[in-house]
Design a protein with these regions (language model features):
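Sec-dependent N-terminal signal peptides
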Residues: 6-8
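Extracellular/lumen-exposed scaffold segments
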Residues: 2-4, 13-137
């Protein structure tokens, strides 16, 4: 009888530990779309795109691209909170924090559905997201 009680208590304890957060490894890395929030709108002949970059994260300036089909479309930086960063993989590079805003001339781009925005960023803790691709509209 004593052995049965020990077995039942051990089983119960094992089940408790297995279901507790102690053994569960939950990801603490948020999705890219939650830390690099992209929005866009059309204002006359300009397309304006902005990123809200959450605290503790940054974008690589040189990763930001606007493309239509395979062609890179030039853009103008309206606002950026840039700084120089020494990256172990990319060397000295410009990064963006907080807000980043660009404008794209819309005079020749009538079909906005084919425009893609590409960007890549990392967390201050060292996790880097793969290149992100988002349709403009």
């Amino acid at each position: 009888m004593r052995q049965l009680i020990i077995i039942l208590l051990s089983t119960n304890l094992s089940l408790e530990l297995a279901s507790s957060e102690f053994l569960e490894k939950k990801s603490t890395i948020p999705e890219a779309k939650k830390v690099f929030i992209v929005s866009s709108y059309v204002d006359k002949n300009l397309i304006k795109v902005s990123w809200e970059i959450k605290d503790g994260f940054y974008l690589y300036l040189n990763s930001v691209q606007v493309k239509k089909n395979a062609n890179i479309i030039p853009y103008t930086v309206i606002y950026s909170d840039q700084s120089t960063y020494s990256d172990e993989f990319f060397g000295t590079t410009k990064i963006l924090r907080k807000d980043f805003k660009i404008s794209i001339n819309n005079s020749d781009l009538l079909d906005l559905s084919n425009i893609l925005i590409k960007y890549q960023g990392c967390s201050d803790s060292g996790f880097c997201y793969p290149m992100q691709t988002k349709k403009l509209l």
